Amino acid sequence: MTSSTQDAAAELRAAVQEYERTDNVGVLFDRVRTVAATVSPAVLKDACVPFREMPEVIIPAYEQIVSQAPGDAQALVVLANAYWLTGRGPDVVGDLASRAIAADPENRGAWHLWALAESNVRERVARWQQVAQRFPGDQLARAAMADNATSLASAEHDPQALDLAIRTYESLLAESPPAAQRSALEHTLKTLRGWQL
């Protein structure tokens, strides 16, 4: 039985090394699940830190964590994000994000995934508006809202969506972003202001 974070991390590292040699994701999942079944969620989280960019490790590990700690908002977000990155689909991601929001309404990552998981662009804009209102300093949420409003304006010739996009980009520009962001925002605004819907 694995007893420590170091032991669990070593077992995960060995599993990943074998995966890198064989490219057998099924064996990797099985080995990660075996480790996950022998340690506490806290130990497993710590052991997974070096592999946080590998959904192949995170998914089976965090499925176990979430099954043992279903109210752990951050674990739900980590699992939802790994699912999102591997194309698992908006329904499962949205469900996990909603559970994370219920567990911790202040978890911005949960709100972001909840908004991303909406497949209807008009509804996605509405979700990003909710996130931006809840977290007014969240520039990423506001940029996502503006990007989605731009898509909506383009696809449906919606002048209200265009106005929302322009106002939001203008507010981001007014916050004195770094030069590269400023240039991108200015270019975007120039383009959008020239649209005829």
Task: Give, region by region, the residue ranges found by the protein language model.
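Terminal, low-structured helical/coil segments at or just beyond the last alpha-helical repeat
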Residues: 11-18, 167-197
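Conserved structural position within tetratricopeptide repeats
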Residues: 66-67, 98-102, 130-137, 167, ...
